[in-house]
Amino acid sequence: MPARTAPTASDRTGPPPAPPRPDGPTHTAIGPYAAGMSDEHLKETTVERRVVHEGRFMTFRVDTIEDPQGKRHTREIVEHPGAVCVIPLHGEDVLMVRQWRTPVERVVLELPAGTLDRTADGGVEAPDLAAPRELGEETGYRAASWRKLGRFWTAPGFTEELMHLYLATGLEPLADYRGPDVDEYLDLVRMPWREAVALAEQGRIEDAKTLVGLLWLARLAEGGELAGKPVAQVDARQSRAGRHARD
């Protein structure tokens, strides 16, 4: 029997396959398979930045960018100093807060979190200092043990805000706690952490950072990794002056 050969284009029936569109989507591997891949075919170049509003701690600007094909577009950007989110684990319970969020016009159940303060020299507060401060201000507790879990962009489509996530254990009430900041109205909620995770899995918690934190907590519990790593404790009142100066 003669050896079989692969069919040539002239042997195939039907129309030839359409060539790939030069401006169409390309499918590339991600994860470890992306090692060594170039980003140049995806990169946008900023050719102009225009600030349209400077707020207390955020700046709004409109950028003109040039895409990989040389076409120009506008991008609306929110500059943000970054933020922290804390998972306060009190035995088998987690501490959360309920507060009104004007953009969504409703009360939201969340993990304690807050924006990094501006420093006197124009810099930004270190996340490792901001996390204990926010925990103290929003819950009235301090933690004996801290573990930084990771960080993530909250909405990279329009803001550079980078959220730093922490696990806080060994909680103790602050002796001199006087409640949250004067412009914050919060309810402190304590519930079994497994119940909070269940609410997240059922779609009853819709805050993104809280979903990330609770599902991360569940993954740690599955692996028996809930023990924290001791770090220097920071008094909850530290850097409060920086916040008032910003306000």
Map each language-model feature to its residues.
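Compositionally biased, low-complexity flexible segments
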Residues: M1-A29
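Active-site segment of metal-dependent pyrophosphate-handling enzymes
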Residues: P81, L89, R101-T102, E110-L116, ...
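Nudix hydrolase/Nudix homology domain
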Residues: A29-G31, S38-V47, V107, K148, ...
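A short, acidic/glycine-rich surface segment
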Residues: R72-H73, P173-Y177
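Conserved Nudix-box catalytic region and its N-terminal flanking loop in Nudix hydrolases
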Residues: H41, V78, C85-R133, A175, ...
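Short, well-ordered beta-strand micro-motif
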Residues: V62-T64, P88, L167-T169, R190-P192
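Acidic, metal-coordinating catalytic segment for phosphate/diphosphate chemistry
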Residues: E48-C85, H90, Q99
